[in-house]
């Protein structure tokens, strides 16, 4: 299944950003920042799919801010190879496409959170899919 992606020439496009400022944490409270990703693959036409990656940053307990960012890319595919995939999302999770998307989204989120209460949130440039 190595030939699913026909053309590695693509341009990631920012789809959506949702930043919500929340209340300050309680004094001496421990705040854990939860980070996770979701991926979606949808067919655009017979020879192309759209791959989107959404990264969520949510503090626990809910305070400071909440961020959700989605970036996507149109990928030209080999139709026969793609149609033979058992799970397209699982394929793209481990493809170079996911690495490009996550690297772009990490940079966007670091810039977006520069002026937050915690300063820039630098998240790992690897996809973090829930198990």
PLM-predicted stretches and their roles:
Residues 1-100, 107-131:
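N-terminal intrinsically disordered, cationic/polar leader segments
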């Amino acid at each position: 299944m190595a030939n699913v992606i026909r053309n590695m020439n693509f341009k990631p496009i920012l789809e959506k950003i949702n930043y919500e400022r929340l209340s300050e944490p309680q004094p001496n409270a421990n705040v854990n920042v939860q980070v996770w990703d979701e991926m979606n693959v949808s067919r655009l036409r017979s020879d192309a799919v759209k791959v989107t990656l959404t990264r969520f940053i949510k503090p626990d307990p809910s305070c400071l801010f909440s961020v959700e960012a989605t970036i996507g890319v149109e990928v030209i595919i080999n139709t026969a190879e793609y149609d033979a995939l058992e799970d397209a999302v699982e394929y793209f999770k481990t493809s170079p496409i996911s690495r490009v998307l996550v690297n772009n989204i990490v940079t966007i989120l670091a810039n977006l959170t520069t002026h937050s209460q915690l300063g820039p949130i630098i998240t790992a440039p690897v996809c973090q899919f829930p198990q």
